[in-house]
């Protein structure tokens, strides 16, 4: 488990390129036949990926000491979106088939969660966010047909994109975790511009569907102290509540957003005009 401490905005603005990457970038999300796990002190979110190829993968009791529990989801809820080939997630003996872009919410208290790929030639890639939970909501599969899609932006401003809301109150109940998938239309490059902050939630972006020769310049920092982190395919970035979170790519791309914090009101945000950015 890679533990990331909270960081003050006054400290963050003094960091150089490598310093910013050390604090906020999750460089390697998927490793064959293993789980990756980054624990952020910011709202206690856990972020990672699971890519089973030759064997099943589960998070065992080895994380118990670091989380102060006897099993992973004893006091946590889990959200998973599969960006790879078809796979299965077995929760306490109940098997769910999770295809490409299917998702699974797993409620607090699930003791055994086992991940597998159906075809080792095209393995599943399970990207997950995990957050503290105060009660148990039912485990539920969510397919792309069940999400709440919203199309925003315009080709003229190069920010036309479709936001697919997987784990939001309109789709299912969670304690605090919200997740969704945003896909840019071909030829569009900007996400979340004009940008915003939200004091009551933090957010993690996971960028994917990018060619090897492409990148995204992820914008972060306070609106008057912006910085950037160069992102490549299948990398994630942590965004504190005080930071904007936006990006521009060399080509169109897709990203998964996950939020935890005080509320789940999607529109509870503080908008920043482009003219006010520095």
Swiss-Prot record:
Protein residues bound to Zn(2+): 196, 198, 203, 245
Enzyme kind, highest EC tier: isomerase
Cysteine pairings via disulfide bonds: none
BP term (GO), one: D-glucuronate catabolic process
Entry's cofactor comment: Binds 1 zinc ion per subunit. The bound metal seen in the crystal structure was tentatively identified as zinc, and its requirement for activity has not been shown.
Keyword annotations from UniProtKB, A to Z: Isomerase, Metal-binding, Zinc
Name of this protein: 4-deoxy-L-threo-5-hexosulose-uronate ketol-isomerase
UniProt source species: Escherichia coli (strain K12)
Gene: kduI
């Amino acid at each position: 488990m890679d533990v990331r401490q909270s960081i003050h905005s006054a400290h963050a603005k003094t960091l150089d390129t490598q310093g910013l990457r050390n604090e906020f970038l999750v460089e390697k999300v998927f490793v064959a036949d293993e789980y990756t796990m980054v624990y952020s002190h910011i709202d206690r979110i856990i972020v990672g990926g699971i890519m089973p190829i030759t064997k099943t993968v589960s998070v065992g009791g080895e994380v118990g000491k670091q989380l102060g529990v006897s099993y992973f989801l004893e006091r946590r809820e889990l959200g998973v979106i599969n960006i790879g080939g078809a796979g299965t997630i077995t929760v306490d003996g109940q098997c769910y088939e999770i295809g490409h872009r299917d998702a699974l919410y797993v409620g607090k208290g699930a003791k055994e969660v086992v991940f597998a790929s159906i075809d080792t030639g095209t393995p599943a890639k399970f990207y997950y966010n995990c957050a503290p939970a105060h009660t148990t909501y039912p485990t539920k599969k969510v397919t792309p047909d069940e999400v709440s899609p919203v199309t925003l932006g315009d080709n003229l401003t190069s920010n036309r994109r479709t936001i697919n809301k997987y784990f939001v109150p309109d789709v299912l109940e969670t304690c605090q975790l919200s997740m969704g998938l945003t896909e840019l239309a071909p030829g569009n490059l900007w996400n979340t511009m004009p940008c915003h902050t939200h004091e009551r939630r933090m957010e993690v972006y996971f960028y994917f569907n990018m060619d090897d020769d492409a990148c995204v310049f992820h914008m972060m920092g306070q609106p008057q102290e912006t910085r950037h982190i160069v992102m490549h395919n299948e990398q994630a970035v942590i965004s504190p509540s005080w930071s904007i979170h936006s990006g521009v790519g060399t080509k169109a791309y897709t990203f998964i957003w996950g939020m935890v914090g005080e509320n789940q009101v999607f529109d509870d945000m503080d908008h920043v005009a482009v003219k006010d950015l520095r």
